[in-house]
Amino acid sequence: MTAPKSKKSGDNVNAKLGLAIKSGKYTLGYKSTIKALRQGKAKLVIIAGNTPALRKSEIEYYAMLAKCTVHHFQGGNNELGTSCGRLFRVGAVTIMDAGDSDILTAELS
């Protein structure tokens, strides 16, 4: 039995994230997210839902210092990796340039 489809907004985030990955600048992973936040290059950080609390709070702290927006992804790191078009797990995604996507200005809920 398959799980029911997620809400439209979840699909909307996936589509915008996919477009940002294809046309913009981004980094994947915890270490590169922290590095981009410390350098002030990050504009949006997306954190997987099953990221450990300590890592999540550390990313949120650096994002607060960098005045960067943080979005908590509804799915886990497997789903976030799939949304990025990767075959591996991704705990955090940093968008530095959205490219053709309007992910930075859109309401991500």
Curated annotation (Swiss-Prot):
<dbReference type="GO" id="GO:0030627">
    <property type="term" value="F:pre-mRNA 5'-splice site binding"/>
</dbReference>
<keyword id="KW-0687">Ribonucleoprotein</keyword>
<dbReference type="InterPro" id="IPR004038">
    <property type="entry name" value="Ribosomal_eL8/eL30/eS12/Gad45"/>
</dbReference>
<dbReference type="GO" id="GO:0048025">
    <property type="term" value="P:negative regulation of mRNA splicing, via spliceosome"/>
</dbReference>
<dbReference type="GO" id="GO:0022625">
    <property type="term" value="C:cytosolic large ribosomal subunit"/>
</dbReference>
<dbReference type="InterPro" id="IPR029064">
    <property type="entry name" value="Ribosomal_eL30-like_sf"/>
</dbReference>
<comment type="similarity">
    <text>Belongs to the eukaryotic ribosomal protein eL30 family.</text>
</comment>
<keyword id="KW-0689">Ribosomal protein</keyword>
<dbReference type="GO" id="GO:0006364">
    <property type="term" value="P:rRNA processing"/>
</dbReference>
<protein>
    <recommendedName>
        <fullName>Large ribosomal subunit protein eL30</fullName>
    </recommendedName>
</protein>
<dbReference type="GO" id="GO:0003735">
    <property type="term" value="F:structural constituent of ribosome"/>
</dbReference>
<dbReference type="InterPro" id="IPR039109">
    <property type="entry name" value="Ribosomal_eL30-like"/>
</dbReference>
<dbReference type="Pfam" id="PF01248">
    <property type="entry name" value="Ribosomal_L7Ae"/>
</dbReference>
<dbReference type="GO" id="GO:0003723">
    <property type="term" value="F:RNA binding"/>
</dbReference>
<dbReference type="InterPro" id="IPR022991">
    <property type="entry name" value="Ribosomal_eL30_CS"/>
</dbReference>
